[in-house]
Curated annotation (Swiss-Prot):
Keywords: Ribonucleoprotein, Ribosomal protein. Transmembrane segments: none annotated. This is Small ribosomal subunit protein uS9. GO terms for molecular function: RNA binding; structural constituent of ribosome. One of its GO terms (cellular component) is cytosolic small ribosomal subunit. Pfam families: Ribosomal_S9 (PF00380). It comes from the Bacteria. Residues 105-130 are annotated as: Disordered. It comes from Acetivibrio thermocellus (strain ATCC 27405 / DSM 1237 / JCM 9322 / NBRC 103400 / NCIMB 10682 / NRRL B-4536 / VPI 7372). Residues 111-130 have a biased composition (Basic residues). Gene3D superfamilies: 3.30.230.10.
Amino acid sequence: MAKVQYYGTGRRKKSVARVRLVPGDGKIIINERELDDYFGLETLKTIVKQPLVLTDTLGKFDVLCKVAGGGYTGQAGAIRHGISRALLKFDEELRPALKKAGFLTRDPRMKERKKYGLKKARRAPQFSKR
């Protein structure tokens, strides 16, 4: 018999996370590694757990996640987005709480491109009057 699974895709900056929620005891596996092994910073671990804590589902699901692209902060945000979307597949009544917390919104902020004639996206070379 097939297990019940809930899928969600999350994105943030250049990161894309494919998240599966499987009924279990609360393990969070990211790219075949435990949450504590994958993210060193406590703030990133907290970001990943936020939707589960908000909806009181922290011990009910195992989170299996494949994430690629970007840095650690972007990946943590993408996982949070993916978990939130997967929770909606589990129970649509969680939508108001998740939406109010802002977990369903795809953060549109991206790195601004570097322009020619400038050192960075907006940083101009030093100006000399004489």
